[in-house]
Design a protein with these regions (language model features):
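Nucleotidyltransferase catalytic core that binds NTPs
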Residues: 4-182
Length: 182
């Protein structure tokens, strides 16, 4: 059985992440596919949203992908162990072009921590410098939240999340950010 998946911090989920989600779905073809949200949370400024809240918002923001979101394993090795236990033997991580090289390490665990007949890491595509989502990043979104800049924050959030819920997410991010975050 084949599976195509992605794994990311999504802190917070943004309109830019939708491009990755679409690429996973397209790459999957007749294979199953999932989007794994990391379990990382901290007060340092990189991971302000609690995993359960992040999953809640991701499902509201991207209802067409909601049944494909998973939250559980803490890293790619844990994900692959889980997928193997579900009967998958052909796995492919679909990640942003800037993450492909950094994810290659996972292959060295094939045959040790898990066993896949086929295991690969591919790009979901290059970021389009002229596209609407190029300027959106989790870091910029967290900075907008800390600056209490709702207009900038709102631009990175899909319209499927209403203003009230967008503001609530921004407030949750603010409450978990260090005071001097830049």
């Amino acid at each position: 059985m084949c599976i195509r998946d992605s794994f990311g911090r999504f802190q917070p989920p943004t309109v830019g992440h939708a491009e990755n989600f679409k690429a996973v779905k397209k790459t999957a073809g007749s294979c199953d596919w999932f989007i794994y949200l990391s379990q990382s949370v901290d007060a340092k400024g990189s991971n302000p949203l609690d995993p359960d809240r992040k999953l809640y918002y991701a499902k509201k923001m991207f209802p067409n992908f909601a049944k494909h979101f998973r939250s559980g394993p803490t890293d790619p090795v844990g994900i692959l162990k889980e997928l193997q236990s579900e009967g998958y033997d052909d796995a492919m991580f679909v990640v942003g072009s800037d993450r492909v090289q950094a994810m290659q390490w996972v292959k060295k665990y094939n045959g040790k921590d898990f066993f896949f007949r086929k295991l690969d890491v591919i790009s979901s595509g290059d970021r389009d410098a002229d596209g609407d989502t190029f300027a959106i990043s989790g870091t910029k979104m967290r900075r907008a939240a800390v600056a209490d800049d709702f207009d900038t924050f709102r631009k990175g959030i899909p319209k499927s999340l209403n203003d009230k819920d967008t503001r609530k997410m921004m407030e949750e991010i603010q409450s978990n950010m260090p005071k001097l975050y830049k």
